[in-house]
């Protein structure tokens, strides 16, 4: 019989995305075997992130200040704004070290089946931001799934009349991928988005 505190820890860890019962048990045993300071630091870090991290008032990224580092960085190009679904998507783009503009995080995608419409996303704030800025190009970097495509199409129709250049990130085959293993939708997208060399 496992002690109740350990069962409670396993149950809480198993609620994390991508963590099943076995992984939760391994994590719990790791925490149990680790020095006491480790558990204290872990619980302090969790408490701190809940108390201090919130949304940037400008782009809705995560920050522990009023505005995030991306919005405060004067070296970033104010004329180019990249719209992403989540903070995780923003970080994925940042890891490429290619994008030098600014961001706007929607915190989701349009999904009528799940009851998510434009009012549940940060679209109104995006429009307000565009009215008060020097943005010339808007890059839509939503995922290439049904909801991401619907969101990109909705935003395109909404923003084109504003005279902005609205672009979409390219889609197709991954680097190092094999044609023979690519699905039909990916191949079709790669063919239609081909470019001159």
Curated annotation (Swiss-Prot):
NCBIfam families tied to this protein: recR
Chain ranges passing through the membrane: none
HAMAP family referenced in this protein's UniProt entry, alphabetically: RecR (MF_00017)
InterPro entries for the chain: DNA_Rcmb_RecR (IPR000093), Hlx-hairpin-Hlx_DNA-bd_motif (IPR003583), Rcmb_RecR (IPR023627), Rcmb_RecR_Znf (IPR015967), TOPRIM_dom (IPR006171), TOPRIM_RecR (IPR034137)
Protein name: Recombination protein RecR
One matching Pfam family: RecR_ZnF
Domain of life: Bacteria
Stored Gene3D superfamilies: 3.40.1360.10, 6.10.250.240, RecR Domain 1
Keyword rRNA-binding found: no
Function: May play a role in DNA repair. It seems to be involved in an RecBC-independent recombinational process of DNA repair. It may act with RecF and RecO.
Zinc finger (C4-type): 56-71
Record CDD domains: TOPRIM_recR (cd01025)
GO molecular function, one term: zinc ion binding
SMART domains registered for this protein in UniProt: HhH1 (SM00278), TOPRIM (SM00493)
Keywords: DNA damage, DNA recombination, DNA repair, Metal-binding, Zinc, Zinc-finger
Annotated family: Belongs to the RecR family.
Gene: recR
GO terms (BP aspect): DNA recombination; DNA repair
